[in-house]
Structures are given as structure tokens and as C-alpha cells.
């Protein structure tokens, strides 16, 4: 038992345990049993929205509701309270002469946080509030701890993230944010299902990290006596399924990267990866735009999205620009020109762009320029395509300029929201790219990956031309809920 549960009980906790014992003495289970509701709070509000006090009285409608007791007032023989369920709150009006003395005692002794079931007549008060005039109250569950004092809006950030259940009880805005997240994911699934994609599941435990540039979490399989890694991407397994003939697949799932934490990064996060046979990166651009716009429309409607005071024109066609053109437009440096690594490093020094030890190709310098000068300017949805081969080990080379790949990233509000490309399906080229990554790893690039020989073997059986995509679900949820930190869209973010 943890020290937290061995703590000395305070006065309120002692009183609540005494009430629990009293319920048992009356033959009432303090933690209840199954209870049949006829409606939730919002259903009743919607159903009777257009009826005034007299009309409701004439209809003589009844309902059975249940929820957590969150407010309570009144003295003597009459009381008012609010029950909170998943949809919101509804008032209950309790009279001793309507429920009986014994039943009224259950209400009277109920504490905030307890769960009650209420049967009664649907009514409207003189103030116009829809309420249930109780005819019977059922005790459903005893809360042995009082709700936080700041119940109507938990404000302590540490408590919000560590004890999300308290945040959900007390912050309706937070509750609705996670409902919105669920809807976003459901709508993405719906969009892809309707386009003939098959949702699949691939392993979380891998023998070799691959499919992304990231440091993995390492674990050990006792029975096999081998070290394994938690997946840093789902890419290579999904492309094996394209080899197997599935043609259109996607997976929404947890990814694990042993890296730093900040406003937009958590060590475990949710991504969606999508692969489509006989498609290229241009087709995947169209698909990406469709996914993002469909998700936005489902929770925000047809118009633009407001994020932290900036209007994001997510409902309009996304801008498309080559990485080299974007760099030239901002810095004047033209990387279309052929140049040696030495020349590129000299330009980087002139522009004060840091050069890492593992930058062994001009493509590394080009990417560094993009990150240094261009990313921070990308506010409206923008597809940046044409990444250098050096930083795109799984993407197909552009047939017209082999220095670059048919790859794109989607940027909104300076952040990357998606990464996609025409997949490399040449096993010989893929092996040489893997070998270059392995060399970079030896030179100190912690994010470079090793060689997945099994994946090379799969490619040798033949993979059709394929387009692939990865989108960070958490960042998309941040955008569509106007949230500034990833922890506010993760129910249980990583904590120390």
C-alpha cells in the first residue's frame, strides 16, 4: 500500500466513513448496484427546451436520472441539488413529503461527490431552470474523499495532470476537450474507412527501431532473452502489408520516443500512418488535406479555425512549396545550384547556421537552413515538399532531380503536423540508405536507425508504387481545441 493511502484520515474523511457505516446498518450498499436511467441531463434539456413551467406541469412527464452530487442547498423539509453526468448538470428538487422521511434522510446525509439516482417529475422552477422533482432517491456510491475546495475549476496544474479524474469532474471545458479529441479520431477513421482503407494493428515491440529518426525505449524479453525496443513508428510493418497485397491500410496507435518533453512533445503519443498502393506523394497531399479538413469540419464547422487569436484558413486549399524555393525566398540562398559540401558549409557559416558533425551531405545543410529560417514563418497550412535524400531515408528520389525526394511535411502555426512521401520500393537503394543511417549513428546521430534486413527482404518480393503518410494526432487535437500544451490533450501525460 502506498504512503498516500496510509495517510492519517482527516475529519471529513472520518465523517464520510461513518456515513458509509450508517448506510450499511440501514441495509443499503454504500457502493450501490446497477441503476436504470431513462435519460441524461442534456437529453432532458433538449427534449423540453421549448416548454415553459405551466406546459411542463400539464404534460406530467417523468424521468429517471443518475449522477454525481455536485451542489446541495436547503434546510428542513426541502432541498435543491445538482447532479452531474457525462453530458452536464441538472437540478433536482427534493421535498420530504414527496419522497418520504426515510428516503429524504438519504438525500439529507448525502455528501458532495456521492452518486445518486433520482426518479421524479420533470418540471421548471420559477426561475425557469429545468429540474426533476424527486419522488424517490437511490444511493448509488459513497465518495470517501471530499472534492477539492476549488471544485468549480481545478487550477493547480500538477493536480490537473496527475489526477485527471479530478480535472474531469471539476473542469467542464477540460471534459469537453477530451470528448472533442475522441470525435476527431472517430471522424478520421470514418473518412479513411469510406475511402476503402483497412484499419490494422502492428506490433508495439520491435527487434530494430525503424521508420523514423528518433531514440527508442529499450526493454528486455525474458522468455526469448533478447533486447527489444518500443516502436518509434508503425511504417515498416505497414509497408510489409502493402507488399502482402492489402493496398490501402492505416493504423492509429501509440508511438514511443525516448526524447525530451515540451509543449508539443510527450514520450508516448498517438499517430496515424496511412499507406496507399499505386499512389504518389501528390495523391497523399490531397488525402492529407482531406483528412485534416474533414476532422476540422466535424468539430469546428465549415469556416476557418481560430488558434490562439490567429485565424487558420484550414477550410481553404493548402499552400504547396518546394523546400529549396522556400529557403531562397527568405534567405536569398539558392540550393538549386550544384555545390560541394565544403561550399555549402561555407554558406552555412556565413548565415550562422550550426553544422553538426554528422552533416556529411549538402542535403543536411539544406535541411538545417529550412529549420533555421523557414519553419518559423509557416503559419497557414503549408505543404513543404522536396526534402533532400540525406534526411529522407525511406522516401523515393525525385525522378527529375535525384538530390531530392518526393516527400512533404505539413506545417501549421510553425509546427509539423504531417510527414509523407512516395515510398522507396527499390530494395537495393533502401539498403544503401539504411547503411548511410547506420554510419550517421556511428558518427553520433542518436536519432539515426540501424538496418532492418527483414524489411529489405520484404521489399525484394516486390512492393507496388506507394504513397505513405504520418500525422500526429495530439498536435491536431491541440490545434482544433485551441490548446497550447500537449498535456492538455493527453488524458494521462507523462509525469516525473
Curated annotation (Swiss-Prot):
Database matches in Gene3D superfamilies: Bira Bifunctional Protein, Domain 2 (3.30.930.10), Nucleic acid-binding proteins (2.40.50.140)
EC number: 6.1.1.6
Compartments where located: Cytoplasm
Cofactor: record remark: Binds 3 Mg(2+) ions per subunit.
UniProt keyword terms in alphabetical order: Aminoacyl-tRNA synthetase, ATP-binding, Cytoplasm, Ligase, Magnesium, Metal-binding, Nucleotide-binding, Protein biosynthesis
Assembly and interaction partners: Homodimer.
GO BP field: lysyl-tRNA aminoacylation
Name the UniProt record assigns to this protein: Lysine--tRNA ligase
GO-annotated molecular function: ATP binding; catalytic activity, acting on a protein; lysine-tRNA ligase activity; magnesium ion binding; transferase activity; tRNA binding
Reaction(s) this enzyme catalyzes, per UniProt: tRNA(Lys) + L-lysine + ATP = L-lysyl-tRNA(Lys) + AMP + diphosphate
GO cellular component: cytosol
Residues reported in the UniProt entry to bind Mg(2+) 2: 416
